[in-house]
Regions:
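Residue at a conserved register position within TPR or TPR-like alpha-solenoid repeats
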Residues: 53, 87, 120-123, 127
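Structural marker of alpha-solenoid helical repeat scaffolds
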Residues: 38, 72, 89, 106-110
């Protein structure tokens, strides 16, 4: 599974998802990067890479991936919420609020009431 042409397999089937979760952080980052080289528009993989960077404390890399995700998929509401959390952890509260406001707009567009509620709650906490 270390070849890029097989990277897509990690997203197929629960068994492979479990294997992915057992991989080291470095291996997960590598796998996601390889997959995105072949599938740059894949929202799930882009989100996954952003989340891996965020969990690793690599804030700028995470935010770069969230930005790419939201440029390609402006209605991917989880991207706004998790980007806002990443910004807030980095002490960038004003940017986190703006991200949440944009996410709330996306949630309204898509009718995603759960995401709307989560982001509105976080925005209230930050205000």
């Amino acid at each position: 599974m270390d070849k890029p042409q097989h990277a897509h397999l990690m997203f197929r089937g629960c068994g492979l998802c479990r294997i992915f979760l057992l991989m080291s952080e470095t291996d997960r980052l590598s796998m996601l990067t390889e997959f995105l080289e072949q599938n740059p528009g894949d929202a799930f993989a882009r989100y996954g890479l952003a989340m891996e960077y965020s969990k690793a404390g690599q804030t700028e890399q995470a935010l770069s991936q969230f930005e790419k995700l939201l440029q390609l998929h402006p209605d991917y509401t989880n991207g706004y919420f998790m980007a806002a959390q990443t910004l807030e952890r980095a002490g960038r509260t004003a940017e986190a609020k703006k991200m949440l406001e944009n996410g709330i707009e996306a949630a309204n567009r898509t009718g995603n009431k759960h995401a709307l509620s989560e982001m509105a709650g976080m925005l209230d906490e930050l205000s």
